[in-house]
C-alpha cells in the first residue's frame, strides 16, 4: 500500500492507538519519523520507541505510548505542513501552541526540533505538526 504522507500516517496511528488505549503502536521506519519521535520523547509525550528489523528489510518503529491516570498524555496531535500545502515560518513567526502548553515540531536546517529549541537556535523551517 502506498502512503502519500508518511508522517501524517504515523501521527494518525498514534492518535488511533491512544483512543483505543493501546500501550504500543508500530509504524514503518524512516529517518524523519525517528527524528519526530525523538522530539516527542524529549518533550515527554511518549515513553520511547525502538527500531526493529522486518523481513522485507525496511524495519519498523515500535512506539511506547504514555498515559497519565488512564488518559493519554497527547490530547491533540495535528499535522500542519502537508504534502499539498507546505508551511514554512521564520523564527519570529513560530506559533505558540495553546499559549505555550503545547509544542510545535519544526524541521530546520539544523535538524528536527521543538519550537522552543528552534527559537533558541534562531532558526525557522517547516512546521511539521503541533502537539498538545
UniProtKB/Swiss-Prot annotation:
Recorded superkingdom: Bacteria
Presence of keyword Ribonucleoprotein: yes
Gene Ontology biological process terms in this record: translation
Pfam families, per database record: Ribosomal_S8 (PF00410)
GO CC term (a single one): ribonucleoprotein complex
Family matches, as PROSITE patterns: RIBOSOMAL_S8 (PS00053)
Any one GO MF annotation of this record: structural constituent of ribosome
Keywords assigned: Ribonucleoprotein, Ribosomal protein, RNA-binding, rRNA-binding
Family of this protein: Belongs to the universal ribosomal protein uS8 family.
Entry-linked PANTHER family: 40S RIBOSOMAL PROTEIN S15A
HAMAP family membership: Ribosomal_uS8_B (MF_01302_B)
Biological function: One of the primary rRNA binding proteins, it binds directly to 16S rRNA central domain where it helps coordinate assembly of the platform of the 30S subunit.
Subunit structure: Part of the 30S ribosomal subunit. Contacts proteins S5 and S12.
Name assigned to this protein: Small ribosomal subunit protein uS8
Organism, as annotated: Cereibacter sphaeroides (strain ATCC 17023 / DSM 158 / JCM 6121 / CCUG 31486 / LMG 2827 / NBRC 12203 / NCIMB 8253 / ATH 2.4.1.)
Lineage: Bacteria, Pseudomonadati, Pseudomonadota, Alphaproteobacteria, Rhodobacterales
Amino acid at each position: 500500500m502506498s502512503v502519500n504522507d508518511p508522517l501524517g500516517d504515523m501521527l494518525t496511528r498514534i492518535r488511533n492507538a491512544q483512543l483505543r488505549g493501546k500501550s504500543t503502536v508500530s509504524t514503518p521506519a524512516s529517518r524523519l519519523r525517528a527524528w519526530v519521535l525523538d522530539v516527542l520523547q524529549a518533550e515527554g509525550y511518549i515513553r520511547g520507541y525502538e527500531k526493529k528489523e522486518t523481513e522485507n528489510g525496511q524495519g519498523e518503529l515500535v512506539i511506547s505510548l504514555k498515559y497519565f491516570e488512564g488518559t493519554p498524555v497527547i490530547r491533540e496531535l495535528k499535522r500542519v505542513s502537508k504534502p499539498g500545502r507546505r508551511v514554512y515560518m521564520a523564527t519570529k513567526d513560530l506559533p505558540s501552541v495553546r499559549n505555550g502548553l503545547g509544542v510545535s515540531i519544526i524541521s530546520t536546517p539544523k535538524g528536527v526540533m521543538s519550537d522552543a529549541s528552534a527559537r533558541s537556535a534562531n532558526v525557522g523551517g517547516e512546521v511539521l505538526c503541533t502537539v498538545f
